[in-house]
């Protein structure tokens, strides 16, 4: 068996959709969307998957605290195969206060060429896709690195091992699918605030 990479996350926020139940290989799971709030006040939408018995009697409008890991899977959306990022909760606790937590810790391997760019506002960004081993499976998780981290990591080759801390964020964007036809889509990625290249043994 391939050794698992580090993949730990904590979330706390408001349940903004009614949990929906489904069965998978004999187990009952529930899925819902969780809203977590940044310091700026912007809300991030997190897709949560959890075994039903661990969630208990939670409904839309409740606040929950979760511990688990970031997962990915492919889904057919609008006749295209797209990567969906989710939070798989191992523990779930209903809470009374309006706490907001969104903390992600990952290690994995660069699995696509890194895309480095600079925004009109002068921000430097590196888009990085990492593969995080999970037994015989692998989760593909997109990262966004900013400014100094973006510069430092832009020339990493595929296969380089990195570790990061950050938050799972969501954003809307416009995509042209045909001449003159633009659709609004949503992406989820981990915004990195602290990073280290394990190959080089640099300190975060």
What are the functions of these language-model segments?
Residues 1-204:
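Single-stranded nucleic acid-binding surfaces, predominantly the OB-fold ssDNA-binding core
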């Amino acid at each position: 068996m391939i050794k698992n990479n580090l993949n730990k996350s904590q979330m706390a926020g408001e349940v903004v959709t009614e949990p929906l139940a489904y069965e998978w290989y004999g187990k009952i799971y529930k899925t819902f969307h969780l809203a977590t709030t940044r310091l700026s006040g912007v809300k991030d939408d997190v897709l949560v998957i959890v075994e039903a018995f661990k969630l208990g009697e939670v409904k839309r409008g409740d606040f929950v605290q979760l511990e688990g890991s970031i997962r990915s899977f492919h889904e057919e959306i609008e006749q295209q195969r797209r990567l969906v990022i989710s939070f798989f909760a191992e523990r779930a606790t209903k809470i009374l206060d309006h706490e907001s937590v969104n903390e992600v810790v990952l290690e994995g391997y660069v699995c696509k060429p890194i895309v480095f760019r600079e925004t009109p506002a002068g921000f430097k960004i590196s888009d990085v896709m990492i593969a995080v081993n999970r037994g015989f499976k692998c989760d593909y998780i997109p990262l966004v690195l900013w400014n100094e981290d973006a510069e430092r990591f832009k020339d990493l080759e595929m296969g380089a091992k990195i570790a990061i801390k950050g938050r799972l964020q969501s954003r809307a964007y416009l995509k042209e699918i045909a001449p003159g036809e633009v659709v609004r889509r949503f992406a989820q990625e981990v915004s990195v605030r602290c990073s280290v290249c394990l190959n080089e043994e640099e300190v975060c």
